[in-house]
């Protein structure tokens, strides 16, 4: 995997100002096998346009698994073999938003999806 994942557990405090990283996912739902969903992740509290971004997921009873990553400017994308050709990662730096278009969904794609830096 070309993109390293960094985990932020504490809000940074600089000169008395609290800077809280927020990543808010939306767009999930229940679909039939073969269906599609578009996931969104609204980012704030950091310079989104300078940051490589990733999607990970956690299937029921399992650990976190990397799904896809995109470079800061969207020019490079990478996918786990299990989703290659079915999922499309993209970003809109003007809206500080990351997307994951999920197509041809399978039962094994059932998971909680998170965006991470």
From Swiss-Prot:
InterPro entries: Ig-like_dom (IPR007110), Ig-like_dom_sf (IPR036179), Ig-like_fold (IPR013783), Ig_V-set (IPR013106), IgHV (IPR050199). It is found in: Secreted; Cell membrane. It holds the Pfam family V-set. Residues 70-77 are annotated as: Complementarity-determining-2. The keyword 4Fe-4S does not apply. One of its GO terms (biological process) is immunoglobulin mediated immune response. Residues 45-52 are annotated as: Complementarity-determining-1. Disulfide bonds join 41-115. Probable non-functional open reading frame (ORF) of V region of the variable domain of immunoglobulin heavy chains. Non-functional ORF generally cannot participate in the synthesis of a productive immunoglobulin chain due to altered V-(D)-J or switch recombination and/or splicing site (at mRNA level) and/or conserved amino acid change (protein level). Immunoglobulins, also known as antibodies, are membrane-bound or secreted glycoproteins produced by B lymphocytes. This is Probable non-functional immunoglobulin heavy variable 3-35. It comes from Homo sapiens. The lineage of its organism: Eukaryota, Metazoa, Chordata, Craniata, Vertebrata.
């Amino acid at each position: 995997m070309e993109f390293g994942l960094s985990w932020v557990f504490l809000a940074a405090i600089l000169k008395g100002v609290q800077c809280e990283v927020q990543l808010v996912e939306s767009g999930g739902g229940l679909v039939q096998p073969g269906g599609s969903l578009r996931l969104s992740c609204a980012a704030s509290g950091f310079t989104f346009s300078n940051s490589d971004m990733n999607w990970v997921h956690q299937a029921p009873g399992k650990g976190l698994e990397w799904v896809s990553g995109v470079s800061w400017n969207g020019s490079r994308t990478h996918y786990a073999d299990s989703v290659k050709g079915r999922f499309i990662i993209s970003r809109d730096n003007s809206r500080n938003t990351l997307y994951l278009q999920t197509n041809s969904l399978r039962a094994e794609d059932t998971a909680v999806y998170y965006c991470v830096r």
